[in-house]
C-alpha cells in the first residue's frame, strides 16, 4: 500500500467513524465522547455512522431501536451470541473457580483432553489464549520457530490484533502503528 493510500482514510481503516462527520443522535455522540475519554485509540469505531448495539442473540445483533443485523463479522461465529449452553457453562464455572492455568485444576485438563480427542494424534498439546491477538501472536511465534523465518504477508486492511508484534502486522490500525520490519503488503 502506498503512503498516499494509507492516508486516504482515517487510521487506515476504510469506512471508519470520524468524529464530527457522522450523523449521530446526541445520545450516541455522548457515548463516543465517553469512549474517547475512557478507551485507548486502538479501539476504533466501525462505520461512518457507528451502530449503537445493545444485545446479541445467535447470529443477530440488535441496535438500541431494535433493528436486527446479521453478524457475519464478529468474534462468535461458531456458536453465536449468548448461546444458552455457553452462558450456562460460563456461569457454572465462574461460580466454582475462575483463574488461569498455572494452578492444578481438573476442569482445565478435562477440557484440554476432550478437545485434543478431536485432533490427529500428532497434535497432542494445546495452548489456551484469551484473545485473538494472543492466538495470532502465538501462531506467529510457532511459525517462526518451526520455519526459522520471520516474514509475514498481509493484505492492505488486515487486522490481526493489538499485541506488539501482531499490531505490526495489522495495517488497519493505521499510520500511527508502524508495520513490522518483516511485514510485506
Residue ranges: model-predicted function:
Residues 62-63:
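Hydrophobic alpha-helical segments, especially N-terminal targeting/anchoring helices
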Residues 33, 69, 74-105, 110-128:
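Glycine-rich phosphate-binding segment of PLP-dependent enzymes
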Residues 114-185:
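PLP-dependent aspartate aminotransferase-fold enzymes
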Residues 24, 28, 54, 58, ...:
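Generic structural signal for well-ordered, non-membrane alpha-helical segments
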Residues 53, 79, 167-169:
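Short clusters of hydrophobic/aromatic residues that line enzyme substrate/ligand-binding pockets
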Residues 3-57, 75:
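Active-site-adjacent loop/helix segments that line or gate small-molecule/cofactor pockets in enzymes
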Amino acid at each position: 500500500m502506498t503512503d498516499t493510500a494509507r492516508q486516504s482514510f482515517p487510521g487506515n481503516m476504510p469506512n471508519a467513524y470520524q468524529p464530527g462527520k457522522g450523523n449521530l443522535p446526541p445520545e450516541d455522540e455522548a457515548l463516543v465522547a465517553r469512549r474517547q475519554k475512557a478507551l485507548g485509540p486502538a479501539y476504533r469505531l466501525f462505520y461512518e455512522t457507528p451502530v449503537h448495539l445493545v444485545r446479541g442473540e445467535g447470529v443477530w445483533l440488535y441496535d438500541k431501536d431494535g433493528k436486527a443485523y446479521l453478524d457475519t463479522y464478529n468474534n462468535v461465529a461458531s456458536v453465536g451470541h449468548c448461546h444458552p449452553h455457553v452462558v450456562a457453562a460460563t456461569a457454572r464455572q465462574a461460580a466454582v473457580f475462575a483463574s488461569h492455568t498455572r494452578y492444578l485444576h481438573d476442569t482445565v485438563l478435562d477440557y484440554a483432553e476432550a478437545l485434543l480427542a478431536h485432533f490427529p494424534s500428532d497434535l497432542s498439546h494445546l495452548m489456551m489464549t484469551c484473545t485473538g491477538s494472543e492466538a495470532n501472536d502465538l501462531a506467529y511465534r510457532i511459525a517462526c520457530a518451526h520455519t526459522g523465518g520471520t516474514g509475514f504477508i498481509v493484505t492492505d486492511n488486515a487486522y490481526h490484533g493489538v499485541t506488539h508484534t501482531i499490531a505490526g502486522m495489522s495495517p488497519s490500525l493505521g499510520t500511527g502503528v508502524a508495520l513490522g520490519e518483516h511485514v510485506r503488503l
